[in-house]
Amino acid sequence: SEMCIRDRAREAMLYLKAHGLDETIKSLTQPVLGICVGQQLLCRHSEEGDVDCIGIFDVDVKKFVPQQHQDKVPAMGWNEIYNLSSPLMKDLGENPYTYFVHSYYVPLCQETIATVNYIQPYSAALHKDNFYTCQFHPEKSGKVGEQILKNFMEL
């Protein structure tokens, strides 16, 4: 299971750099969609493995710190997303639910196009230039996820 792999961000960045893909990704001009750890890798730095990432988004990825006894990490399950903006988030209805599985999060930032609240509010999705991301899994999010993927294909 993906949750059992430690330091996924570090391992992924080592692979991308070893194959020159970090620079290739930065140079892409077509729409790009990063999902889950893909969102995190497009940020500046990740606490997961303490690794510098691709840096499209000028924000650092943080590890969840449970605040109350009911807070579970990894965050796993359905959660509501809100404050939707960007063509990626069109036609989703009000505050749709999407499926999340992650232990690290991207804080709210200038490029946040959807917000989610678990332990604290954070970025459920980002957009800058031709780069779009989802912390949640659209492929596991039913009709809402299907609409997001359709929106992406129409960009």
What is each PLM-predicted segment?
Residues 1, 44-46, 103, 141:
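Short linear Ser/Thr-Pro motifs
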Residues 3-5:
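Short, small-residue-biased leader/transition segments that mark boundaries at the very start
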Residues 27, 60-155:
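Amide-donor transfer/coupling interface in amidating biosynthetic enzymes
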